[in-house]
Amino acid sequence: MWKTTDLCDEFENELQICRQSFRSFGKKEQFHGKIATVKVKDDNVLVKEGLQTLPEGTVLVVDGGASTNCALLGDNLAAIAEERKLAGIIVNGYVRDSSELKNINIGILALGTMPNRSVKEGKGDRNISLQFGGVEWKPNDYVYVDEDGVIISEKSLYR
């Protein structure tokens, strides 16, 4: 079993440490996987498309620009991720249906909750490098999450 603290000790010069504070909403507190990215503004169509197409074990990183206008993820989309065996979802934005999310057996991190739903226009970008939390989130890098933090590595550190 790995811990982010141990990975930081062992691979200190090879990691990025996310400086953003997230809240955990999913059933899993610890998760890791290869990163896939989505950048959107108050629109979760590309989030849904990503969840429906990404391979098992992936972590979808959603940059919603920390917008407080709406939630980008709720129980329906999280259930798709669970059904498809994704490792987790990290949202630089907000979620809703939090009482249901805690029963979804994946990792889910977000800034907080917002009851308002997103628009459905399909605007945004997928598979691009993102910048938030003081780190660069690049597709196909690896992210490791537990109760102590979020770290990113260009290579797999744990199998």
Swiss-Prot record:
The keyword ATP-binding does not apply. Keywords: Lyase, Metal-binding. It catalyses: 4-hydroxy-4-methyl-2-oxoglutarate = 2 pyruvate; oxaloacetate + H(+) = pyruvate + CO2. GO terms for biological process: regulation of RNA metabolic process. Its cofactor is a divalent metal cation. A divalent metal cation binds at residue 97. CDD domains: RraA_family. Gene3D superfamilies: Ribonuclease E inhibitor RraA/RraA-like (3.50.30.40). Substrate binds at residues 74-77, 96. It comes from the Bacteria. It is an enzyme of class 4 (lyase). Pfam families: RraA-like (PF03737). GO terms for molecular function: 4-hydroxy-4-methyl-2-oxoglutarate aldolase activity; metal ion binding; oxaloacetate decarboxylase activity; ribonuclease inhibitor activity. Divalent metal cation. Its EC number is 4.1.3.17, 4.1.1.112. Catalyzes the aldol cleavage of 4-hydroxy-4-methyl-2-oxoglutarate (HMG) into 2 molecules of pyruvate. Also contains a secondary oxaloacetate (OAA) decarboxylase activity due to the common pyruvate enolate transition state formed following C-C bond cleavage in the retro-aldol and decarboxylation reactions. Belongs to the class II aldolase/RraA-like family. Homotrimer. This is Putative 4-hydroxy-4-methyl-2-oxoglutarate aldolase.
